[in-house]
Amino acid sequence: ISWKENLRVAWFGSFLTGASISLVVPFMPIFVEQLGIEGDQVAFYAGLAISVSAVSAALVSPIWGILADKYGRKPMMIRAGLAMTITMGGLAFVPNIYWLIFLRLLNGVFTGFVPNATALIASQVPKDKSGAALGTLSTGVVAGTLTGPFVGGFIAEIFGIRNVFLLVGAFLFLAAILTIFFIKEDFQPVA
């Protein structure tokens, strides 16, 4: 198993995941308005739509960690990528604010690509290279998170907000596919 190859793929997947999460932030209030929310309620529902994902992720992350220890990091990366493909891509089709909040909640429930990529690389890299490898990996999610709002705003301006969600779904699907075919893991369950 080449940890360097895994690092390259995990970096790109983490970049796509970070970008996907932050792509939607700049225009969430506008999207909430398009769903029929008006006045002071726009800020509330936009904030709720953004934060509900983080809150649900915080609550279920320990469960995904236990399952990663039992079944491996790669399956958890694939699960997160494929599930978030549906939850984020599905936002393009929400008819109202309730579906938006529900899919954002589910998105948080099924998240976990980046922490599992980190755990995978940490378990494979030689000890004397762990700082450099994990530092490199973290630049992927940071670069994606920094790039996402600009790209999301640009795409929303030209192609419309709902198409940004489809693009995000495609990014997450690509991360899952790259993980399936190029990430290698010789997993031994944690005793």
Protein language model annotation of sequence segments:
Residues P29, G144-A156:
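Small-residue (Gly/Pro/Ala) motifs that create kinks and tight helix-helix packing interfaces
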Residues T87, Y98-L106:
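Paired small-residue
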Residues L59-L91, P95:
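Conserved MFS/SLC helix-loop-helix module at the cytosolic interface between two early adjacent transmembrane helices
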Residues T179-V190:
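Helix-loop junctions on the cytosolic side of multi-pass membrane transporters
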Residues A54-P62, G112, T145-L146:
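Residue-level signature of mid-helix packing/kink "hotspots" within the transmembrane helices
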Residues W3-E38, V42-G47:
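Helix-loop boundary and gating motifs at the non-cytosolic
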